[in-house]
Amino acid sequence: AFICSIVGLSVGQHLTLVTNPRDIEGFIKILRKRPFHLLPGVNTLFQALLMNPKFKELDFSACQLTVVGGMAATPETAKRWREVTGLPILEGWGMSETLGVGTANPFNGTEYSGNVGFPLPSVDINIRDDDENILAINEVGEMCIKGDNVITHYHNIDNTTFFTADGYLKTGDIASMNEQGAIKIYDRKKDMIIVSGFNVYPNEVENIIEEHPKVAECSVVGIDDKLQGQSVKAYVVKADNSLNEDDIKALCQENLAAYKCPRHIEFIDELPKSTVGKILRHKLRKLAHEA
């Protein structure tokens, strides 16, 4: 949103600041009052808007671009967003250490791509294994970045764990790069679940669960398991009270390898989120540990 605001100001656009985006009714009133051309947000915000019947009554003819950042957009959200607004969701990636942005999809994109786009000019990105070896096209590892907009060190701490030997920042994101140079992010390295030696990316499991029409939103974490090291636990917010564990398990078993399927499912009234709407998995891990 910050980068979109700067871009908007640079071309003379009027900015409308929604001070409480969690007030979906109030948010929709603002969108109805002011024709909007660009709408940036996080996936959970778009999910909440889509669940409100009044959102579908808005006039989207002026809107030219919707951008998701901060967390991955789920395919189901992108699909429903296109059906309601007629617009694709475009994703980008960045962090504070890259001045907010490091990759972006072309603004003239017409379809949801499932990736976060291409490195910006003067930015170099590669994918590395745990020994800092650069991986081949489409291989999965940690995304590392270097460029004019990327920090070169942290102040007053040992930087060896945060940078490669040749000066690339380790982002902590598990990713791959395709033949065209587009980056696909699978998950945060710290959120990856290891079940009997196999890697499970929470985003992949969440994408499947959110395909169920009775699911409002969900989040997946790893919990300690004496036999497997870790097992998968899903926290699910219902969109329909008739939803049950068997519904979730059947969907996952149909679409995921057995080790990726949640062994534990807990229904919850709402997911813990940051002030900008990002789901806080560390709080869910703490909740699971205390259970």
Where are these regions (language model features)?
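Glycine-centered tight turns that cap/initiate beta-strands
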Residues: 54, 62, 86, 122, ...
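Conserved AMP-binding/adenylation subdomain of ANL enzymes
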Residues: 1-38, 52
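Gly/Ser/Thr-rich phosphate-binding loop
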Residues: 10-13, 36-41, 50-111, 124, ...
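Beta-strand->loop->alpha-helix junctions that form or flank phosphate-binding loops
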Residues: 90-97, 117-119, 221-224, 266
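Active-site glycine-centered loops adjacent to acidic/histidine catalytic or metal-binding residues
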Residues: 70, 94, 117, 173, ...
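AMP-binding/adenylate-forming catalytic core of the ANL superfamily
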Residues: 32, 39, 147, 152-153, ...
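Conserved ATP/PPi-binding loop(s) of AMP-dependent carboxylate-activating enzymes
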Residues: 118-122, 133-162, 200
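Acidic/polar alpha-helix N-cap and adjacent early helical turns
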Residues: 287-291
